[in-house]
């Protein structure tokens, strides 16, 4: 997801999305270990999505406007 799309979500929606992305990342890592993962870029994309969500939550916490 793009940061602009994430900024339109509420904090509660962002927290739910963050938990979902963390579960997805865990599943991708398990698939990688088991040799079932075919698209390795999904791991890095998911990690970047998690970072974007955390950044937006932190910006809101600090009151930074973008």
UniProtKB/Swiss-Prot annotation:
Q: Which domain of life is it from?
A: Bacteria
User: Which Pfam families does the entry link to?
Assistant: Ribosomal_L29
Please provide the Gene Ontology terms (biological process) for this protein: translation
- A cellular component term (GO) from this record? cytosolic large ribosomal subunit
Q: Record's Gene3D superfamilies? A: 1.10.287.310
GO terms (molecular function) for this protein are: structural constituent of ribosome
- Ubl conjugation found in the keyword field: no
Hey, which family's this protein in?
A: Belongs to the universal ribosomal protein uL29 family.
Protein name as annotated: Large ribosomal subunit protein uL29
Q: Which organism is it from?
A: Thermosipho africanus (strain TCF52B)
> Which gene is transcribed and translated to give this protein?
rpmC
């Amino acid at each position: 997801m793009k940061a602009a799309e994430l900024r339109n979500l509420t904090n509660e929606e962002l927290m739910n999305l963050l938990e979902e992305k963390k579960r997805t990342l865990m599943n991708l890592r398990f698939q990688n270990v088991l040799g079932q993962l075919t698209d390795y870029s999904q791991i890095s994309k998911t990690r970047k999505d998690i970072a974007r969500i955390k950044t937006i939550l932190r910006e809101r916490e600090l009151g930074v406007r973008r």
